[in-house]
């Protein structure tokens, strides 16, 4: 089958032919329709320090997808041939304390599709049936293919009650932008997002941001004053991994505020702990998606009117993957879709 793989320990990916995956007793085989390019795939493309330490070579990558079940293992129940599915990209052990307690998103032995094992940038993907998630017919293939990052945004944004709250999001990547739409959809009052990328900030405005702030030109404090915010933000969502953004978020938080961290800062990032301690802030780390509560919430929000369509800005045939990666690398894109049926 055709697949997009890391064949050598260096930059780039190669469209190649690989063996179609075998299907275990508890697996489903998915014929891929659409995939989306993730920031993780960009790290793999660039072959940065993280990728060099993490990605086995050779291996085909990718973990954002939608497709159709074409084969099932003999033990699989609850699915049928022809079901349209996306899937949870974190394959968990099922035996650690958190897995046995139903907290699989906290599994200490997680294996990542397209990171630690063969991925979805291919004509077929085999995964445990437990990880597959049926997609309702009213949700398009394009939207279903971005459920993985949509899930990151949902898990982060809905970690705390947002109804009537003022929310600050630092980092206008696709996940941060989707978090804007989620926060507004569930009833946040002011949703402010910061970045230095004007293209991405304009996307955030299209997704409903109260203010999209280029912090290279505009003061967050001035924006807060314009919005008549006298006590700071109630909820902070750090999506950038940039230390200065995290610092500005902590400074802008109200006493008793709640902060969710999805962005990954450098390991030795220093912060002013006085901002955390004396403000009584609650800080929560976010990894992946809750299985499968996050997935149910994603579907429910789309069915109740959440519009994520502006975040999908580019579409290419899978054979034109280099154009897709170029769009992502340019910084002037939202989500980029690769069509495996073209």
Swiss-Prot record:
Site-annotated residues for Important for catalytic activity for the proton relay mechanism but does not participate directly in the coordination of zinc atom: 148
Positions annotated to bind NAD(+): 175, 195, 200, 262-264, 286-287
Q: Where does Zn(2+) 1 bind?
A: 38, 63-64
Q: What is its EC number?
A: 1.1.1.103
The record's comment on cofactor binding reads: Binds 2 Zn(2+) ions per subunit.
Q: Which cofactor does it need?
A: Zn(2+)
Known pathway: Amino-acid degradation; L-threonine degradation via oxydo-reductase pathway; glycine from L-threonine: step 1/2
What are its GO cellular component terms?
cytoplasm
Catalysed reaction equations from the record: L-threonine + NAD(+) = (2S)-2-amino-3-oxobutanoate + NADH + H(+)
Q: Provide this UniProt record's keywords sorted from A to Z.
A: Cytoplasm, Metal-binding, NAD, Oxidoreductase, Zinc
PROSITE patterns associated with the record: ADH_ZINC
Gene Ontology molecular function, alphabetical: L-threonine 3-dehydrogenase activity; zinc ion binding
* UniProt-listed Pfam families: ADH_N (PF08240), ADH_zinc_N (PF00107)
**Annotated binding of Zn(2+) 2, by residue:** 93, 96, 99, 107
Example of a GO biological process term:
L-threonine catabolic process to glycine
Gene3D superfamilies named in the record: Medium-chain alcohol dehydrogenases, catalytic domain (3.90.180.10), NAD(P)-binding Rossmann-like Domain (3.40.50.720)
Q: Which cellular compartments is it found in?
A: Cytoplasm
According to its UniProt record, which residues of this chain constitute the active site? 40, 43
HAMAP family (alphabetical): Thr_dehydrog
Question: What does the subunit comment say?
Answer: Homotetramer.
Family assignment? Belongs to the zinc-containing alcohol dehydrogenase family.
As for what it does, the entry says:
Catalyzes the NAD(+)-dependent oxidation of L-threonine to 2-amino-3-ketobutyrate.
Record's protein name: L-threonine 3-dehydrogenase
